């Protein structure tokens, strides 16, 4: 969805865009990847490792609406130029020492953390405060990152989220297993 809007605003032809499986066949010396959020950097890092041969001799740019310093560092180590619109830091993590979320009501912070973490452990035991302890509190109209608090998005263990999270399909086989009757 974000790529569609980017293409429309930049008035770019669909010919300028390729599927990841076509990277090796492209003659371009420059590859630009566009993403909404890059918080832990793990997904982007795995993508580049999986396509390392295809990226050889190419200049790689990674555009992201939101990124963390951790994710920036991971990709810069791979010689990838990362261009984020905004970099989130400890101030954006709900329960960090530097968090801006409770600056007006600091006395509520510990009580809120106990409640959020308590429910989080029930609905997402391995990521009670979000993937990689994200502690973020944001989402988009089309999806919500798993780094955000799971009390907002998880539907595990009978929880009814206020926002539905749609998992990404990592490959065509995974999508076909779930939606094969449509294909």
Locate predicted features.
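Active-site metal-binding loops of divalent metal-dependent hydrolases
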Residues: 35-37
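PRPP-dependent phosphoribosyltransferase catalytic core
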Residues: 5, 49-183
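Structural motif
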Residues: 30-32, 61
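Short, glycine/charge-rich flexible loops or terminal/linker lids adjacent to PRPP-binding catalytic cores
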Residues: 1-29, 39-46
């Amino acid at each position: 969805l974000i790529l569609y809007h980017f293409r429309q605003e930049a008035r770019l032809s669909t010919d300028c865009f390729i599927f990841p499986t076509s990277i090796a066949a492209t003659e371009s010396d420059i590859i630009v990847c566009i993403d909404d959020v890059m918080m832990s950097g793990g997904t982007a890092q795995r993508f580049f490792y999986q396509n390392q041969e295809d990226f050889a001799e190419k200049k790689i740019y990674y555009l992201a609406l939101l990124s963390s310093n951790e994710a920036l560092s991971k990709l810069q180590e791979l010689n990838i130029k990362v261009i984020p619109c905004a970099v989130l830091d400890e101030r954006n993590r709900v329960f960090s020492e530097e968090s801006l979320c409770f600056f007006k009501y600091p006395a509520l912070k510990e009580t809120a953390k106990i409640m959020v973490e308590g429910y989080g452990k029930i609905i997402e035991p391995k990521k009670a405060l979000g993937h990689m302890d994200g502690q973020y509190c944001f989402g988009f109209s089309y999806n919500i990152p798993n780094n955000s608090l799971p009390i907002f998005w998880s539907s595990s263990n009978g929880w009814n989220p206020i926002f539905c999270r749609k998992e990404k399909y990592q490959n065509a086989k995974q999508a076909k297993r779930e939606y094969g009757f449509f294909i």
